[in-house]
Structure formats: structure tokens, C-alpha cells
A protein has these predicted regions:
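Loop-rich non-cytosolic ectodomains and luminal regions
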Residues: 1-169
Length: 169
């Protein structure tokens, strides 16, 4: 009954998505600074997630959370999600000159689909997309930024990126 609560709004999401991770970092900074100012411990519940990124602990956000969690008397709790039964992730290894096919189930009524493919920086991989009707796009060119393709009635927007200085994947 005597607990003090600090609530931080991350910002108003744009119509394209959720608040940016930089807003999450700013919010964490604010909470820890307030905890130091009031000389009180801070327990932070982060119920903010997405399926983007390599999830290997090397992103700028992941490293920031690691660092800021060591300041003062803080406990940062992050939910791990409940998408395991949804088969939203896959991983694997393959050898040189080995072709690997990863099938993705898409419903007829599904208006869009976001797929991310992550690899180690030093690995050289050719990636192609094959539609259910057999239209093949690729191998994808290593052109940084957005690329557009059409496969039948389907428009494909592909964004090609590279690792940041904070991540090898």
C-alpha cells in the first residue's frame, strides 16, 4: 500500500509500428536517474518486445540493458515471450555449397509477412525467394537499403542491411 510507482510512457507509436528502441533506452535512463535521485531501488518491468533482431545479446539495446542494469540498486525484468508454439523462429547450420530450403506457411488471407534472415558477418550466403507458384527471385543482391520485387500478384519489399558495430550478426 505504501509503494511508489514510476510510470514511463515510451512515446506515441507511428502508424507503421511501435515506439523505437531508442525511446526504450531513454525511458530506462530516466528510471535509473530517478532512482539515484531519490536514493531508492528500482524494479523495471519491460513488457515491450518484438521478433526483430538476432537475439544473441550483441545488439545496441541488449548491451545497453546489460550496462544500465549494473547501475545503482536496479532489477530489470524482461519477458521472454510466448511465441514458442507459433514456430515463428528457426535456426540451423549448413555447409559450403549446400542448399537449404526453409518453407514458410502463409495463409491466403494474410495481407503481409515480415521475414528476417540473420547470418554471421563473415559468412557468405546467397538468398533466393521462391513463391508457391514457382516464381524465383534471387539470389538477392547485396545492395544496402530497400529493394522491390513482384512475384505474380505479390509485391515483395526487401530491406538488405548489414551488422552494426555492436553486433556480428
Amino acid at each position: 500500500p505504501e509503494s511508489k510507482v514510476l510510470v514511463v510512457k515510451l512515446g506515441s507509436p507511428s502508424k507503421e509500428g511501435f515506439p523505437r528502441t531508442t525511446e526504450l533506452m531513454t525511458g530506462l535512463d530516466y528510471v535509473i536517474r530517478k532512482a539515484l535521485e531519490y536514493r531508492m531501488p528500482a524494479a523495471v518491468n519491460i513488457s515491450f518486445g518484438n521478433t526483430y533482431g538476432s537475439h544473441d545479446g550483441t545488439s545496441l539495446l541488449e548491451r545497453y540493458i546489460d550496462d544500465i542494469s549494473n547501475i545503482w540498486k536496479s532489477c530489470i525484468c524482461i519477458g521472454t515471450g510466448n511465441e514458442a508454439s507459433g514456430a515463428g523462429h528457426t535456426s540451423g547450420r549448413f555447409r559450403d555449397d549446400q542448399e537449404v530450403v526453409i518453407e514458410i506457411a502463409v495463409q491466403d488471407s494474410q495481407p503481409s509477412l515480415n521475414v528476417q534472415i540473420w547470418k554471421e558477418y563473415v559468412d557468405v550466403v546467397d538468398i533466393s525467394l521462391v513463391s508457391p507458384s514457382g516464381i524465383r527471385i534471387g539470389p538477392v543482391q547485396e545492395i544496402l537499403g530497400p529493394q522491390r520485387f513482384t512475384a505474380g500478384q505479390t509485391e515483395i519489399l526487401l530491406y538488405y542491411g548489414e551488422p552494426s558495430p555492436y553486433s556480428t550478426a
